[in-house]
Amino acid sequence: VFNIESRVHGSRGIPGDWRNTKEHGGGMVLDWGVHLIDQILMMLSERKLISLYATLSFVTNEAVDDGFKILLNYDDGLTCHIEVGTSNFINLPRWYIQGENGTAIIEDWNLNGKIVMVSDWEKRDAVPVVTAAGLTKTMAPRTSETIKEYPLPSVHSDIKDYYRNVFKAIEGKEEIFVKHNEVMRSMRLMEAVMCSAHENRVVFFKDSQLRWE
């Protein structure tokens, strides 16, 4: 896997409550961003994050961000794109993942999607397609005999497990799932997002705890 894209899109702007007030923690970075960022950090916890670049949008609200785009770069060449938009009347896929031998797509919250993988690397001679600029082989689609489609795997989960763990941790029966250092990493990354967007610069991380300058 060399690229992961995680998106959540809507078309209603920011709701008229605390989400559109800066002093109450409003804006999409703090509302949705914290969840998508934490998700990526947990998925890629064994990889080293080296830099970040982010932009914020203010289409429907000047006080707080109503959307954002974050590009994460890892030391092994992996890139991650995290995006939230509230002025999207046509949604892009919830997940889009590229690997050397295939691509996976998850369209929505209902896990509609598929995995397409190369089944034959030997048949390389593509049939040219006609474009406005003429013939091209570069963007010619693969033929059915060189790729294979797979369904998305189903993974069972229960959001209540988190709350059960908090209850048992308070009782001293279990160790807490979410550690303080994991929370701190997410908070530091969100601060780096704000810095990158406001100063229009790449933020470089100094260590695995995502300290930055």
List each language-model region with its residue ranges.
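Glycine-rich phosphate/pyrophosphate-binding beta-alpha loops
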Residues: 34, 61, 83-91
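C-terminal glycine/acidic-rich active-site capping loop/insertion
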Residues: 101-181, 203, 209-213
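Non-transmembrane alpha-helical segments in soluble domains
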Residues: 41, 71, 163-167, 184, ...
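Predominantly a Rossmann-like dinucleotide-binding segment in NAD(P)-dependent oxidoreductases
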Residues: 1-61, 200
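A short, glycine/Asx- and small/polar-enriched loop/turn
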Residues: 62-68
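Stable alpha-helical structural segments in soluble proteins, enriched in small hydrophobic residues
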Residues: 158-162, 190-199
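C-terminal capping/lid region of NAD(P)-dependent oxidoreductase domains
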Residues: 1-2, 195-213
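Active-site beta-strand termini and strand-to-loop segments that position acidic
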Residues: 70-77, 97-99
